[in-house]
C-alpha cells in the first residue's frame, strides 16, 4: 500500500485490512513515499517521521509490514520504481497488488512508465466517502475498485486538527498521536 502517510490514520488501516481480506492477501506492505513527486509544492513531513508513524500504526497486525524502499531511495518517488524494487525483493512468482486511494488512481494515466507498472502489479483503488472515479479509461483487467466502510478521515484534516490544537484521538492510532506530540509535527 503506497501513500504519503502524513500521518497514517485509521482509514488507511481499515482500507488495507479490507483489501487483504477481499483479495486473500498474505500480507500488506505499507510503503511510505520518500519524496512524493505529486506533492513537490506542498509541505510534507520528513520521511523518517512518516515511516516511524507507519511502523507504530501497523505493529499490532501480523499481516502488516512496512518497507523503507521508497524513503531509502534518493530523488522523487515514482510508483514504477517502488514496484521494480518490490519485484526484485519478492521475486517473479509473487503476485503484487498496489493499493492506493481512488483519488490517486484517477491520476494514474499521468504516471511514469504506466504500461510496465500494469505488468508488475494489479492496482486496487480504495474508494473514499463521496468520491467518484471519473476516468473510465482504466484497464479493467489490471485495476480494481474496492469500497471500504465509510471513514471520513483524511491526513489533511488530521494535520489541520493538530495545527489548531484540536483532538486527534481515535482518528489515528494512539501511538501515532503520541509520536506527533513528541515530535511536535504539524504545529505552526
From Swiss-Prot:
Molecular functions per Gene Ontology: ATP binding; nicotinate-nucleotide adenylyltransferase activity
Pathway: Cofactor biosynthesis; NAD(+) biosynthesis; deamido-NAD(+) from nicotinate D-ribonucleotide: step 1/1
Catalysis performed (reactions): nicotinate beta-D-ribonucleotide + ATP + H(+) = deamido-NAD(+) + diphosphate
SUPFAM superfamilies, per database record: Nucleotidylyl transferase (SSF52374)
Biological process annotations from GO: NAD biosynthetic process
Enzyme class: transferase
EC number(s) from the headed UniProt entry: 2.7.7.18
InterPro entries: Cyt_trans-like (IPR004821), NadD/NMNAT (IPR005248), Rossmann-like_a/b/a_fold (IPR014729)
Any Pfam family: CTP_transf_like
Keyword Iron: no
Keywords, sorted A to Z: ATP-binding, NAD, Nucleotide-binding, Nucleotidyltransferase, Pyridine nucleotide biosynthesis, Transferase
CDD domains: NMNAT
Function, as annotated: Catalyzes the reversible adenylation of nicotinate mononucleotide (NaMN) to nicotinic acid adenine dinucleotide (NaAD).
NCBIfam families per UniProt: cyt_tran_rel, nicotinate (nicotinamide) nucleotide adenylyltransferase, PRK00071.1-3
Protein family per UniProt: Belongs to the NadD family.
Protein name: Probable nicotinate-nucleotide adenylyltransferase
Organism, as annotated: Salinispora tropica (strain ATCC BAA-916 / DSM 44818 / JCM 13857 / NBRC 105044 / CNB-440)
Gene symbol of the encoding locus: nadD
Amino acid at each position: 500500500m503506497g501513500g504519503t502517510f502524513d500521518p497514517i490514520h485509521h482509514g488507511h488501516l481499515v482500507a488495507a485490512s479490507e483489501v487483504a481480506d477481499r483479495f486473500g492477501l498474505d500480507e500488506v506492505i505499507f510503503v511510505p513515499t520518500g519524496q512524493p513527486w505529486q506533492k513537490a509544492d506542498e509541505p510534507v513531513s520528513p520521511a523518517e517521521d512518516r515511516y516511524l508513524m507507519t511502523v507504530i500504526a501497523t505493529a499490532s497486525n501480523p499481516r502488516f509490514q512496512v518497507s523503507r524502499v521508497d524513503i531509502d531511495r534518493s530523488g522523487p518517488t515514482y510508483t514504477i520504481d517502488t514496484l521494480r524494487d518490490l519485484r526484485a525483493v519478492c521475486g517473479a512468482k509473487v503476485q503484487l497488488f498496489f493499493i492506493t486511494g481512488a483519488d490517486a488512481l484517477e491520476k494514474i494515466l499521468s504516471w511514469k512508465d504506466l504500461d510496465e507498472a500494469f505488468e508488475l502489479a494489479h492496482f486496487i483503488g480504495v474508494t473514499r466517502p463521496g468520491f467518484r472515479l471519473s476516468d473510465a479509461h482504466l484497464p479493467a483487467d489490471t485495476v480494481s475498485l474496492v469500497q471500504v466502510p465509510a471513514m471520513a478521515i483524511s491526513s489533511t484534516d488530521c494535520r489541520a486538527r493538530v495545527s489548531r490544537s484540536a483532538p486527534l484521538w481515535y482518528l489515528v492510532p494512539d501511538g501515532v498521536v503520541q509520536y506527533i506530540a513528541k515530535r511536535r509535527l504539524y504545529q505552526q
